[in-house]
Amino acid sequence: MTRKLKAAIIGSGNIGTDLMIKILRHGKNIEMGAMVGIDPHSDGLARASRMGVATTHEGVEGLTRMPGFAEIDFVFDATSAGAHVKNDAFLRSLKPGIRMIDLTPAAIGPYCIPVVNGDMHLDAPNVNMVTCGGQATIPMVAAVSRVAKVHYGEIIASIASKSAGPGTRANIDEFTETTSKAIEVVGGATKGKAIIIMNPAEPPLIMRDTVYTLSALADEAAIAASVEQMAAAVQSYVPGYRLKQQVQFDRIDTPIRIPGVGNALTGLKTSIFLEVEGAAHYLPAYAGNLDIMTSAGLRTAEHMAERMLATLAVAA
């Protein structure tokens, strides 16, 4: 039987519960060890118990008191940015080598977008999965950036209000700050900006994302091809990720001002329109924001675990 490494999930809300179901159904190198929450009556903890997963409603302290804590190699944190900083410090004081997959905007570890820089951080003790909007859009900024110098990248993530739990709502400022910075660090833009919209429409609308870049003039066909290749790469772990329409281009000949970038910018404006349909593992298919975040987190952990297991096999 193939050995798997055990993971705990902190946060029994929408993201944590969706991730748990993914691991139970599709985990290759990772298996569930514990589901951790703070509300004894949460649906996530109840569902975990029904699915045979060990649970605690006593937070990270409760996790460390569980009989199986010694076997936990990975911890996915789906709480909030502020809580993650404390969780990482507390758990690392007890298990210095534990791997943390940060699903909050805390970003105390390097930003990780699997299709862009995932292989760069396989040995990192803590990686940050940016945000749902970042996972959807930063690959597109990077796709333009590998063809032309991107001066400015702006993304707008529109998600169904019903898909946003209390953790997401409490982290709006952190969402915009972390995503904006990751557009620069991972996407390659000189300046990044992020906007999130929670759409209260009924019935809930599917996640949609818009990406605008202003770059140096370049071959439009090459940029379009790069975008399509990147979209296909994301689809390998988020099947519901797709381009909504063809990439659009506008040449900016009249100099424009972009604060923080320059006062006389010209070049090529690229507009990319995306749609992310969820796999409906927990919330319905409109919650593509959950799906892309948990899928990216699991993809990253799977690659880390594969590397760790290979090292153990060689040592044996």
UniProtKB/Swiss-Prot annotation:
NAD(+) binds at S12, G13, N14, I15, S163, A164, G165, P166, G167, T168, R169, A170, N171, N289. GO terms for molecular function: acetaldehyde dehydrogenase (acetylating) activity; NAD binding. It comes from the Bacteria. It holds the Pfam family Semialdhyde_dh. The keyword NAD applies. GO terms for biological process: catabolic process. Its EC number is 1.2.1.10. SUPFAM superfamilies: Glyceraldehyde-3-phosphate dehydrogenase-like, C-terminal domain (SSF55347), NAD(P)-binding Rossmann-fold domains (SSF51735). This is Acetaldehyde dehydrogenase 3. It comes from Comamonas testosteroni.
